[in-house]
Amino acid sequence: MGKRFSRTLPVAHTLMGSLLAGASFTAVAQAQDMPAEALDWQAWGEEEAANQLCRGRYVMPSYRLPAQENPEILSLEASEVDYAANGEALLRGDVVLRRGNEEVEAERVFLPADREQVDAEGNIAIRDGRALVRGEQAMLRLNEDRATLGNSHYVLYDQHLRGQANQLEQTAEGEYRLQDASFTTCDPGANSWQLVSSDIRLNQAEGFGT
């Protein structure tokens, strides 16, 4: 395996905050379900399964980058990094960004010289310990708490809930508004029921949708 490049940078806001606070995500609500493993799904063991209604649960994997003493620091790691004379940077190959409890994975990430925006492409996954959001294209405005994400799927770990949405925005901490969206508590690949609506509001702390 070739050498991977790592770096830390100070930024003003959290990555998940940038992705969910006042953000808009573009996706197809009725797209095909993602594979269970892509949604951080783990099956119960034989002994555990006997006492459970569902076949498994959603579990966030371990962080790939270590935590920094200063939670404002943005850590970067990638297989290849190209720096331009004007300060722009292009990261390629299994890119990982982490700040505080938020971690982002992508195949390619572009950082402008001012580091106020992140443009990511390819197999994107954003996790913060409570939620997972996946897509193929994302634009994060780090200093404005705004972002857009294409082809999005989401998981709320503790609520055993997953879904898709045309537009997803966070209206308050742990509260989300999804437009042209669906959600279900069924196991991945088993949509015995799902709610499909032009407007769904989710409360992550309470675990309900309206």
Label each region the model flagged:
Residues 1, 7, 24-26, 35-46:
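A general, composition-driven signal for non-globular sequence regions
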Residues 2-30:
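Gram-negative bacterial Sec-dependent N-terminal signal peptides
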Residues 32-210:
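Structural signature for solvent-exposed beta-strand/loop edge elements and short helix-capping sites
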